[in-house]
Structures are given as C-alpha cells and as structure tokens.
Amino acid sequence: IRGGSSLTASNDPLIVIDGVVMSSGSVEGLSNPLSSVNPTDIESFTVLKDASATAIYGSRASNGVIIITTKKGKTGSVKINYSGNVSVSTRKNKIDVMTGDEYRDFIINNPNATEAMITAVNLYPGVNTDWQDEVMRTAVSTEHNISAYGSVKDYLPYRVSFGYTNQNGILKTSNFERYTGSVSLTPKFFDDHLNMNLNAKGIYIKNQFADTGAVVGAVSFDPTKPVKNDNNKFGGYFTWTTDNDPNG
C-alpha cells in the first residue's frame, strides 16, 4: 500500500478482520488472509496508509493497514438474500504453430533430416494433434451465496451466511474451490448500555494447481504424435522416454 520498505522482510499490509489481526502465517495453508473472507459478507473496507496506521497498530502497520468489517444482524423480521453468478473464461489468443501434416512435410523435405527423424514423424500417419487445445479449455466458474438476518425480539440481532465458490482455470485441472460459513450475534443488554459482538467463521479451501510448464510444452511438442496410443506403460498416453523411443 505504501510502497516497498524492505528488501528482505515482507511488504504485505496488515489485515484486520472484525478487529482481529490476520497475517499471512496466521492460518496454516492460507497464503493470503483476504481469500478467507466471502466478498458478500463485507460491510466496509478501509485502507490506512499514513501515520494513523502506525499510531494504532505500531510497527506491524509499516506497510499500511486494511480494515475489513463484516455485515451484522439487524433488528426486525427475518430476511433472506441469495446471490449467484456464472462466469466463463477463455484464452485470448492462440500461438500459431505447425500442424502435424505441415511439420511432417517440413521434416521429410528437409535435406538435413536423418532417417530416424523421418521415421519418427511417419510413425502415426495422418495424426494432427493440437496440443494447445489439449491442455487449455473454456472454463466455467460458479459462485453461490445465501444469508439470513434478523433478530430474536429486539435484543439479539443475528446474521448467518453460507457461500460456495468453484473457479476453474483455463489450464486443465486447475481449480479453486471454497466453502465459507459465518455466524454473527450482536446482543444488547441493559437498555442498550452493553453491546456485544460475537462472530464465528469457518472456511474450507481446496486448491488444485496445474503444471504451468504444460503451456510451453504444448507449443513445442511434436504435433505428429497422438494424445494416446496402445502403450500401457503410462496409462495409455503417448510420451517420449529417456532413450527417445518414438513409440512412447
């Protein structure tokens, strides 16, 4: 927020959620505390980046502070809200490379091609594999959020919410899945002279990271080879072995 202030230490801002200070290591397996918050649960989002940040939180706020306040219950009858969306992601461009037939003709007509190279490209006649299409996809993602809020008589406002996010990446097998749940109670006692805030949040995140090296491999891999062949060594998938066996 305030610009990098250290060459070796973290330059991440301090994140405060409902008065609780969160750091990148405060939740095991969660690199960014912001991903633990359902966006539909956020009431306000405040950024502090001047001297007031360090005055309140000390040296921990040297990189600025992000203060998040989540929604609370309101007095009145029960109200239920639902929101959802579906999004579609696709690659913007495709790198133009040779087809299997073009590459096969290029090798056959190359005076410097060896007999082994010509044999390799003719191993699967007519095969034209577009490896970019094999590793990329049009990704469909969904998000659903439902919440209920109200109060028990006038002294116990409450809010309960549940959210589900399933985000697919354009690289096959990449996926982000998140379940969030929260309960907020804000009871009032002694004619509103005593107010309490009770918050409980739960989150389950499942990340599946795809091998980004597959993008480079898809551009450079031999288009004359099929995705699958009759070799069961590698689950039926074609692959070059360490001895460069063109039979995979």
What are these regions (language model features)?
Residues 1-18, 44, 54-74:
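Extracytoplasmic beta-strand/coil segments of soluble accessory domains associated
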Residues 2-4, 85, 199-205:
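Short loop/turn motifs enriched for small/polar and acidic residues
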Residues 7-9, 13, 22-31, 64, ...:
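Residues embedded in well-ordered regular secondary structure
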Residues 18-49:
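Short acidic/polar hinge/loop motifs at secondary-structure boundaries
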Residues 37, 60, 74, 175-177, ...:
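Short acidic-hydrophobic sequence patches enriched in Asp/Glu that either
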Residues 37-53, 142-210:
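Surface-exposed extracellular loop regions of Gram-negative outer-membrane beta-barrel proteins
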Residues 102-108, 184-186, 200, 219-224:
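Short alpha-helical linear motifs
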Residues 203-236, 240:
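Outer-membrane beta-barrel translocator/channel fold
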